[in-house]
Amino acid sequence: MGAGLAVYRGLTWGLGLVLPAAAGLGRADGAWRGALTGASAEGAASAGSIWVHAASMGEVGAARRWVDALVEAGVRPPLLLTTRTRTGLERARREMPGRVAARIAPLDLPQTVRALLESACPSRLDVVETEVWPNLILEARRARVAVVFVSGTVSARTERRLRALGVAGPALLGNGVFALARDDEAAARFRALGIPEARVRVAGDLKADFPSPAAVPAEGERVAVVFGSFRPGEEATALAIAEALHGMGVEEGRPATPPARPLLVVAPRHEEGAARARRLFAGAGYAVFERGAAERSVETLPAWLSRAASGARTRVAILSTHGELPEAYDHARVAIVGGTFAPFGGHTPLEAASRGCPVIAGPYHDAVARALGAIARDGGAAIAPDPASAAAVAASWWRDGGFAARSQAALRAARSLGGAARRGLEALEAWRLVP
């Protein structure tokens, strides 16, 4: 074991002796208390099954497709699913009832990870995308539980951080660790970090494994431009698009009915984003429609969108609920890819593309470059260098009559990138990791 890894183990072991005493300071149902808990009812309920770990809400969405594939392949539910955020936990429990026993992931302390492994006795640990936590991996290996990175990706920043900390290499990622990489670049990074070539396969991106809709809504049913996964720093883009769309239709002499009047729907990535969007648009003088849990309980999303789009003054709506963004894309003529107009690397454009919705992305799209490139090559996506350009493209696409061609291009690209779950299961068979 290298010096960096030994130091990390020593420090976290010491923290594991004192931090659990602080668990009582948090709410009984809070993430803090859950993160300091090892053995749990969820572990016992899923004993002997597979442990799936997904960092946050976005990864939980990918994990859902993996869990569905595992259960359909014969894995006995419930599986254990852990996540590090409250919103991720809520999504897992809402979207996978009966299929997973979900809880907050333990902190990366040897004692808490070991206790959960001992209570759950998983047959395998599947880490969705990238969460390289040394104790999680080492304790799983110690318990002879294979670790598989699923839809795995390693950014250049993560690789540099692991090397700087001195925790990369076969001491961490040696025997018992496998990678189902998202693409060739990720596969090369996993190999460089210490996973042998024979235990690395390119399987693809789980976020591309979206079910094909039974029918793609026609242009006339699409009343909105949807800014999905809106992040801090993207306010200028959202405001520029709102201004470009404001007043279209009536001023151009077109009928004052949807979809002649574009509705901008902003769906924040995190809860605090709703307040930020509210302040932004209210400060600019827009009448803002908002959908939260209360509205969701009494009105369907299509009805809410139709009502917002037909309002005399409403030009902007905020979607504050969790789990409704995919359905919102069914009613969008244009999707703006969040996390690409501020340095976050981008969120998947495939969720919108798989619904037949063309996408516009900004300059910060390195994390989704492959998917975005595939959609753009056939005309289903555009890359805008700045907020003004994004607004101009959105306005042009709204009225130029090219929706059908762009929609079909986006659908074709999304379907061509699917199959990650199937290829992953085939690799597990070859590695003899199927329980």
Question: Where in the sequence are the language-model features?
Answer:
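Conserved sugar-transfer catalytic core signal across GT-A, GT-B, and GT-C glycosyltransferases
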Residues: 136, 234, 324, 347-348, ...
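C-terminal alpha-helical cap of glycosyltransferases
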Residues: 416-435
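Acidic donor-binding loop of glycosyltransferase active sites
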Residues: 120-124, 312-344
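Hydrophobic beta-strand scaffold residues
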Residues: 145-147, 288, 359
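Donor-nucleotide binding loops and adjacent catalytic segments primarily
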Residues: 69, 75, 82-84, 89, ...
